[in-house]
């Protein structure tokens, strides 16, 4: 991120120039301080204790069978979010840390910022010999893609997470054939 901060800021400037709703500008802005914040957030996530394989609960059945509830990855998590570019990096890092793949669809207002952040994240995965395809970014403003994602991808996506306002959450809950968190 730090090596590519000028590239990130350049892409972010495109989003800021195209911003239709001026009240979104503060949430869209990526400057050196916010890029450092994204880097810090990713580092914190990397330092989290590995959540996979944790014994969450144990009990013994009357027939003396020992049962363990163990944390496992969910699988493929689709995340639909609004105009905060930092969410791209946070969600990709959280999904990776928890052993999950992610499909990211950010708000149209931040498409250039989200695209560069997703690209850099995938590039970092590849450099670290991790399959970059465990993070996918939907590089389109077309809302029909979201409709198709919610209604036709239930064989491929295990859970959908809407991150945004009431309107987004309501739409996802109404139209999704995939479990929604």
Label each PLM-derived region with a short phrase.
Residues 123-137, 158:
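A glycine-rich helix N-cap at a beta->alpha junction
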Residues 4, 27-34, 109, 113, ...:
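Catalytic cores of large soluble enzymes that bind and process phosphate-bearing ligands
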Residues 1-67, 94:
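N-terminal Rossmann-like NAD(P)+-binding subdomain of aldehyde/semialdehyde dehydrogenases
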Residues 31, 44, 62-69, 136-154:
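A structured beta-alpha segment of the ubiquitous adenosine-cofactor-binding alpha/beta core
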Residues 40, 47, 51-124, 128, ...:
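Conserved small-residue-rich beta-alpha loop and adjacent elements
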Residues 76, 137-181:
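Conserved NAD(P)+-binding/catalytic subdomain of aldehyde/semialdehyde dehydrogenases
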Residues 7, 86, 112, 144, ...:
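Short alpha-helical
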